[in-house]
């Protein structure tokens, strides 16, 4: 279904030419997969992404899609690393999972750089993802190695020192979340809902497991490993497909799946909506509607060993009736998967992509605002021992919940106006005192144009420091203007990361910045939206920074750059920074 959507854009140019299929496969991976096998809300790319392709390339893509012959994509070339043993324990302060800790605080306590040195960060090396137009995966750093996925499904293990290639592995679809490394094992998921375990030293496959059979299911968030269990979040692209008037919307239900790490066997699976979707009314064109549906889990689960709980945020419902567990923070039992409590913050939120198009046929009659929880909850223990579970929503509201009292709401703070691509998108960070929240509020000039009407470069952005104890605003770093840069927005959609004294945050405008945790002052600013000379000789360019955040360990700061979805700037590079580039 995802390929069919791309094919409709170019099928008129297609001709029976089987010789084009292999080139078309590579082009699909490079130009289409990041949208059509990516975010559910990103199934319609900016018009420029397709129109910029030469006619011959459009024909090649159409030929590949019509023949549907599987052709392996090639890995990005690069200097091979010298043979060496991989020792994960050699890292005193690794970044081995999406949120660094089980609490998902994205706080690197021992980064190998001081706050005074952040202004001296310079490019150490750049690695190009050959032929791709997006680079938005979350890197991890363990044992002197970098692990990072890609839109084409290639997973790379690189040398932290110089970007050399230890190994590559080809998944069945794009890999957007973090690669979780534990000892000799590396775990990750792809955008066709398959979880993988590979040898962290060699990349050899140990097992793969399909965690959901729905055709739109995917693993967009990162898995989490704890106490001999691998917890996998499941979301979907059905919110996008559901916008088509001829599609029977919708039957997907978000879930968390617990797997046995040595074998991949399923231990339990808990749907965020307990009720199986049933036929509802037909739409105006006679297409059968289904519900309840949705409540995808878009981000890494948060582990609470004290209460033996797992916390996740859920997305909206796709159809009516809207579920009471959508747009909510949900606590599950670690052992059984049983739901302990639910705190819903936006009721009645039934939304799909029809609600942002000219054809409203499949848009729920009482359409909601699309206020997902896209980020992982952050479990913070304050200096007095009190615990607060913090989560930001696409409504632009940051919440503090009491994890020790059924998730009771402690406070809420509004930082923006929110919306389908607004509010708080992919993640925040906390140093235990404050939570550092990037604001998106990404806006189109024409909301109904689905990214084709141009970006409003005057709206969005800002980094907010919120005191965890009471939700009070400590400071705000106002967004920088885009000026006349094309495909630019000041929105901060990517997750932040924090080290002692500094917060790192990437922007849709391509800038990667460090802010003082004291007052929000900009300590360092680099524009990644440019061409880079890469260690692997690949033509590479940076662009918008979105979805994935920074990883910091061993004195090195990593970020991916390039995200053309919704009209942002394309790019295909992984960047490593260190003090003076050493």
Regions found by a protein language model. Name each.
Residues 1-3:
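N-terminal secretory signal peptides that target proteins for export/translocation
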Residues 6-16:
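Bacterial N-terminal signal peptides
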Residues 15-27, 77-85:
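Electrostatic cytochrome c docking/interface patches
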Residues 29-39, 61:
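The canonical Cys-X-X-Cys-His
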Residues 41-51:
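Flexible linker/context regions in extracytoplasmic redox proteins
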Residues 51-76:
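C-terminal capping alpha-helices of c-type cytochrome domains
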Residues 79-124, 272, 276-277:
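Blade/loop signatures of beta-propeller domains
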Residues 115-130, 154-175, 180-188, 193-217, ...:
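Extracytoplasmic/lumenal domain signature
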